[in-house]
């Protein structure tokens, strides 16, 4: 026995010995080493513990509180200024006075912070700007050099040598990873040696999508599936042909899953595959558990109250949305048994059942509910044959003869003659139905229709539509004198029967009459109700708004009636006559406009604009003598009117009656010597070539009106035309002394200096003009263009930046700034311009030109339309629009733009005025000027 005893047993362990360390074991502690777990309610070992400390939970709370009370109050957590990092009294209670003290200190801190906030922020901003100036970004340092890259030619670009690579060869030529397909011999070798084997995942079989290998959903494979007969590798060579066939078969299976077997088109989007899967889930809006809960809840409702129809309907619809249509049908049929008097249950049953079965269900419903209109309507809808529909509806009318809905449905299926007979019976059964009475009146003859409408008024004395239909009937048969009487009687009768006259409803009825062609009726309705319910001081404003509303709704006769009534009430109001005249000009005929203007000048003889509109209408129609006679009458009513004098002069000069024009101007200068009369006198002599007479008249005019800048401009331009540059400069300088705030004078003087080559002097003139006229966009724009024409693009860009700082909301500056940028930056600049000047026509025109330059034709056309809609007086916009249509539009589009421009009669625009005010074009029409301006435009932007 001693021989078998191990020699180390009973001996002390060597120093540092850890049992089990050699075989990898580690020390651990078990529950038996530390004792069983103790509940918080277990008593502690100390039986004499005071109350509050006798359980394990009380001891744990005490220890935790003791840990929380240990605050870090050593020197490392102390600061001389702030004290301890934590609060010395954090363990104390936070009372209301503590909260009040904290609020006071917070308010003091906030106040101290705001005292020098602006100064501090300004100082920080200046420091940042100074830092950026001293240390600019690399991009800013090379910005001027980058602009010069635009001047580099293509040959210079190609001649730039390639940048060398200073790295070593291995870094310069990295070895790319090469992927080589595994050869077939590799598979054959390992197949023969049996080192590897492959198997087909059961989830990839023809039952694709199942998580189990057998369609029955069992968790075990079918018998023999895991035996060596199937899952072990075979012996022999690999048959690559069979592998290829298997791969093709698998591909066909997958394609068949995502393809339409009928049309062959793919119906599953690979990118949205998961979304498509979600869409296949029934749209009940909940998961399976929610459906089960709802099903149980509805079952409980049905069992508790089996005669409650909504429970059966809800149960059937729940089964329907979950895809169990037959269960839904069974439920709803059971519901019809339990609730045979519920109309909704029968209709739901008819909806869920297929065609023939639905007819049987409806027939059964009719037996239980012979008075249900909805069931009869549903029965008619289920029939496909017209005769069957008629038969169903007639049967329904036998049971429910007072149903308007059934009568209407039945009448719609009949021929006119049968419908008339049926409606005669319908109005007897439903005498309070306005629609049936009106339908019968439409099918009857004139005499019978009058009788029908009279009966309708007797049965329904409170409906306005019967009266309006009667008025339309009389108008359609030529009795227009009866229309006014019928509408007046309608208002009286309705009021007598306690009906409140709703003005808005009657106006809508009048607009419907207008659209139907019943002009007399709509005008009579308007005259009858236009003044109802309006305060006397609000009448004019309200009526003008009503007229605008009618025009917007394309009810022109209603608007004409409103204007006619307003002119009767306000015959001496020039504004009403003017709006009516503009309405006739835009929507009426020339004859109606002239007739209105004749009445207008009779009531408002002092309204010059009305006289001028009448004369212009006659002149445009080619009736010059009539225009002269109108102006003669205008002279009698307004003997010293400047506008009428100038209109008469224009009429004579446009018709080549220059001597008449001279005599008229001479009379005007003697009787009404205004600055404009003198200006027109000078211009007439100038355009006729009488330069000396023009200069004499100009000198005479300046003696009377030296502060009228246009006279100084004309004097300088006449001298400039004669190549007398010194005299022209002197005229401009004298004019600027008298009119220092005239922008055109500054521009003319600057361009004169530029024309004779004095660029420095032109620049100085513009700088001086900007000092005397700060925040003037026109002067800034000319300064920018001056530098750009001189080739100093950098200075031009700098000036543009300053201009936009001084005039940040100037559309004309922003439009110029867009095209000062290089092409890639123009779009960004245009966005900035639109943010600053969203509704400025110059900015909109710049955006349209930008789209034009990018060949975005549709967008460009859209923005041109916006531009001319916002400001139709801007001739440049029309010229660019016309040029655009000449290049990209059809003849119809070009003609439309030209006609719209002629109707708008634009007067402003830089390019437009340069052509229209040229003395060689003084007799040209708007359309001719449009063509000339468009010809000058070169789309090099």
UniProtKB/Swiss-Prot annotation:
Compositional bias of kind Basic and acidic residues: 39-65
GO molecular function terms listed in the Swiss-Prot or TrEMBL record: identical protein binding; nuclear androgen receptor binding; protein-macromolecule adaptor activity; ribonucleoprotein complex binding; RNA binding; transcription coactivator activity
HAT repeat feature ranges: 384-416, 418-444, 445-476, 554-586, 588-620, 622-654, 689-721, 723-755, 855-887
Superkingdom as given in the UniProt entry: Eukaryota
Modification comment: Phosphorylated by PRP4K during spliceosome assembly.
Subcellular location: Nucleus, Nucleoplasm; Nucleus speckle
One Pfam assignment: TPR_16
Positions where Phosphothreonine occurs in the chain: 180, 266, 275
Protein name: Pre-mRNA-processing factor 6
Species: Mus musculus (Mouse)
Lineage of producing organism: Eukaryota, Metazoa, Chordata, Craniata, Vertebrata
Gene transcribed to yield this protein: Prpf6
